[in-house]
Design a protein with these regions (language model features):
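Active-site region of glycoside hydrolase catalytic domains
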Residues: 2-48, 72, 91-93, 101-310
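A common structural microfeature
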Residues: 12-14, 61, 78
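Active-site mouth loops of central-metabolism enzymes
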Residues: 49-63, 139-141
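A generic structural signal for short
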Residues: 55-56, 95-96, 198
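Internal amphipathic alpha-helical repeat/solenoid segments
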Residues: 60-67, 90, 100
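Catalytic domains of carbohydrate-active enzymes, especially glycoside hydrolases
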Residues: 63-84, 117, 294, 298-299
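Glycine-rich, proline-tolerant flexible connector loops at the mouths of alpha/beta enzymes
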Residues: 83-96
Length: 310
C-alpha cells in the first residue's frame, strides 16, 4: 500500500457554501414573481412537515446584504445559489421580469464586493407553475426551448461577472422524487416511462444550455451537479457483483455518462427498451448530447451515503 503525506488543500481551493432559492429567499409573491411548483405543492395537506412553506424562509430576498456580510466573516470564498426561474420569467416564458433580474444582479455585486465568488445554479427544482399548467413542465419537449431561453437570459445578464455555472442541481433527485416516489412536484408515483422521458428532456436542456453559454463565454466553467451514492456488493458472489453493476448503471452512470460522455449506458438502455420505457429521441439529440459533453468543465458531486447491493 502506498502512503503519501498530504500537503493540504491548494491555496485557491474554493471553500464555500450553497443554497436553493426556494429554501432561503422567501418573498414568494413579491416584485412580479409568480408561483413555482413548490409554492403550490407545499399547500397540499400532508406534503410537508406541519404544513411548513418557503413563503418567508430566512428572508434572504430582503436580508441578502446582511447574509453576505456574515458569509464574509465566516471566510467563505464562494457562494453557490440558485435562481428562481419564476422570478425571472413569471410565466416560464414570454415577458422577462426586470425586478427579478435586478435582485440577482445586486446579490452578485454584493458577493464580489465581499471577495466571494458567485456560482450560479440555474435550476434547483422550482419550475414555474405556469409551465406545469401550460404543458406539464418537464414532461413536454417544449420545456427544452423555454429552459434554454431562460438560461441564455441569465448568461447574457451576468456572464461578465460570473464564471462558474451549474445547469441542473441533482437531476436524478428531482426526477426520481417527482415521478417515481411522489415526494416532490408533480407528485407522481412509479410513472416509469414518463420518468425516463422527463430525464431525457432535462439532459437536452442541460446540453443546449452548455452550448449556449460556451458560445457567449468560451472561458466560462460549466457543468451540472449529481447526487452520487457509491454502491458496493454485499459479497463477492457473482450474482451480487452483477447486481451492483446493474444498479450503478441505472442509478448513477445513467446520468453521469450523459454529462461526461454524451451517451447513455448501453446496458441500461437495452434494459429500458426491453421494458418499453426507454426515452424517445428527436433527430439530432444524440449529436447535441455528445457535443455538450465535450465542452463541460466539471461534474458537481453531492455525496450523502453509500448503499449495499445484493
Amino acid at each position: 500500500m502506498y502512503f503519501k503525506e498530504s500537503t493540504g488543500f491548494p491555496k485557491d481551493f474554493l471553500w464555500g457554501s450553497a443554497s436553493a432559492a426556494y429554501q432561503v429567499e422567501g418573498a414568494w409573491a413579491e416584485d412580479g414573481k409568480k408561483p413555482s411548483v413548490w409554492d403550490k405543492f407545499v399547500r397540499i395537506p400532508g406534503k410537508t412537515f406541519k404544513a411548513t412553506t418557503g413563503d418567508k424562509a430566512v428572508d434572504h430576498y430582503h436580508m441578502y446584504k446582511e447574509d453576505v456580510r456574515l458569509m464574509g466573516e465566516m471566510g467563505l470564498k464562494t457562494y453557490r445559489f440558485s435562481i428562481a426561474w419564476s422570478r425571472i420569467y413569471p410565466d416560464g416564458n414570454g415577458q422577462v421580469n426586470e425586478a427579478g433580474l435586478k435582485f440577482y444582479e445586486d446579490l452578485i455585486d454584493e458577493l464580489i464586493k465581499n471577495n466571494i465568488k458567485p456560482i450560479i445554479t440555474l435550476y434547483h427544482w422550482d419550475l414555474p407553475q405556469a409551465l406545469e399548467d401550460q404543458y406539464h413542465g418537464w414532461e413536454d419537449r417544449r420545456i427544452v426551448d423555454d429552459f434554454v431561453n431562460y438560461a441564455t437570459t441569465l448568461f447574457k445578464r451576468y456572464g461578465d461577472r460570473v464564471k462558474h455555472w451549474i445547469i441542473l442541481n441533482e437531476q436524478n433527485v428531482f426526477t426520481g422524487h417527482g415521478w417515481m416516489l411522489a415526494k416532490h412536484p408533480p407528485g407522481k408515483f412509479k410513472d416509469m416511462k414518463t420518468y425516463y422521458q422527463v430525464n431525457h428532456h432535462a439532459f437536452m436542456a442541460h446540453a443546449k444550455s452548455v452550448l449556449a453559454l460556451k458560445e457567449l463565454y468560451p472561458d466560462a466553467l460549466v457543468g451540472s451537479s449529481f447526487a452520487y451514492g457509491p454502491a458496493y456488493a454485499v459479497s463477492d458472489k457473482p450474482e451480487d457483483q452483477m447486481a451492483c453493476v446493474d444498479y450503478e448503471d441505472l442509478k448513477s452512470y445513467y446520468w453521469m455518462d450523459v454529462y461526461a460522455y454524451g451517451r447513455y449506458p448501453r446496458s441500461a438502455m437495452k434494459y429500458l427498451e426491453s421494458l418499453g420505457v426507454a426515452p424517445h429521441f428527436e433527430e439530432g439529440d444524440a449529436e447535441i448530447l455528445k457535443e455538450a459533453a465535450s465542452k463541460v468543465d466539471f461534474m458537481g458531486v453531492n455525496y450523502y451515503k453509500t448503499c449495499s447491493i445484493e
